[in-house]
């Protein structure tokens, strides 16, 4: 009886595991395979940034789940991103290729009435602790980026499928951008060379920007050209957009723009 229970229990665990693996494959598009040589299950593309972010979130969730109420020993950022409640319905609409209607306002005109926008959502983007959706604006007949924190209501238009073809290579739309600011019509990616001075001291509260940027690159195109005793020189290929300029300004005198000249001139003017 015990051996039969063990066999049945083992079969149940195996079926549960296979079902979970199937759900992960279908929902998150992550492939998990069994390594026969070690008899262990492995994620086949664990170097992918998307997979790494999911695993990081799972690590945090598992730690919190294992230890119960930790409010006395763990403190979270109080400035929580708004609009995350729309992630799930937008993701569902993306998967099912369905239109949704947004009730949307602009930050600089928040007192005015919300605008209604019917969109065909293609991609969700996180940047600087905010979420955005890249979508086809049906009324404007153009690609637009909408901040989820500016959505007041979302109506799920379940019966209406996409009427516009999904643009080719839409997943690469933000590749040349620092965050979610794209400005395709006027801005092209440029080569930017930056020198970050090394601080004489390095603390938890004031990290050395040169070392910090090795661990947390400014952009996926970042390359280290050279590292000297007093500075590190980085090269990027990126669109020079207002959010990128704001990021550079946050480093103050610790960053020097080597190229292009017009970026150096713009930063100098803003620092006065």
Where are these regions (language model features)?
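Short, positively charged loop/turn segments that connect secondary-structure elements
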Residues: 2-16
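DNA-binding alpha-helical recognition surfaces that contact promoter or target DNA
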Residues: 19
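Bulky hydrophobic/aromatic content
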Residues: 22-110
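Residue-level signal for tight coil/turn positions that link beta-strands
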Residues: 36-38, 128, 148, 229, ...
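Polybasic (Lys/Arg-rich)
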Residues: 172-272
């Amino acid at each position: 009886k015990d051996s039969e229970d063990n066999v049945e229990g083992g079969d149940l665990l195996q079926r549960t595991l296979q079902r979970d693996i199937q759900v992960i494959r279908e929902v998150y598009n992550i492939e998990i395979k069994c390594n026969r040589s070690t008899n262990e299950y492995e994620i086949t593309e664990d170097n992918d940034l998307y997979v790494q972010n999911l695993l990081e979130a799972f690590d945090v969730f598992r730690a919190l789940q294992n230890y119960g109420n930790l409010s006395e020993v763990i403190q979270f950022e109080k400035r929580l991103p708004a609009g995350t409640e729309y992630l799930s319905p937008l993701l569902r609409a993306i998967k099912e290729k369905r239109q949704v209607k947004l009730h949307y306002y602009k930050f600089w005109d928040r007192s005015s009435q919300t605008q209604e926008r019917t969109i065909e959502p293609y991609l969700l983007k996180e940047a600087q602790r905010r979420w955005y959706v890249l979508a086809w604006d049906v009324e404007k007949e153009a690609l637009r980026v909408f901040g989820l924190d500016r959505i007041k209501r979302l109506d799920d238009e379940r019966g209406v499928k996409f009427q516009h073809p999904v643009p080719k290579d839409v997943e690469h739309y933000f590749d040349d951008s620092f965050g979610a600011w794209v400005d395709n019509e006027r801005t092209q990616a440029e080569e930017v060379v930056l020198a970050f001075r090394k601080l004489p001291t390095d603390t938890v509260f004031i990290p050395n920007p040169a070392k910090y940027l090795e661990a947390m690159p400014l952009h996926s195109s970042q390359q280290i050209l050279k590292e000297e005793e007093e500075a590190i020189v980085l090269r990027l290929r990126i669109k020079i957009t207002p959010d990128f300029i704001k990021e550079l300004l946050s480093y103050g005198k610790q960053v020097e723009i080597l190229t292009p000249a017009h970026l150096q001139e713009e930063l100098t003017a803003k620092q006065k």
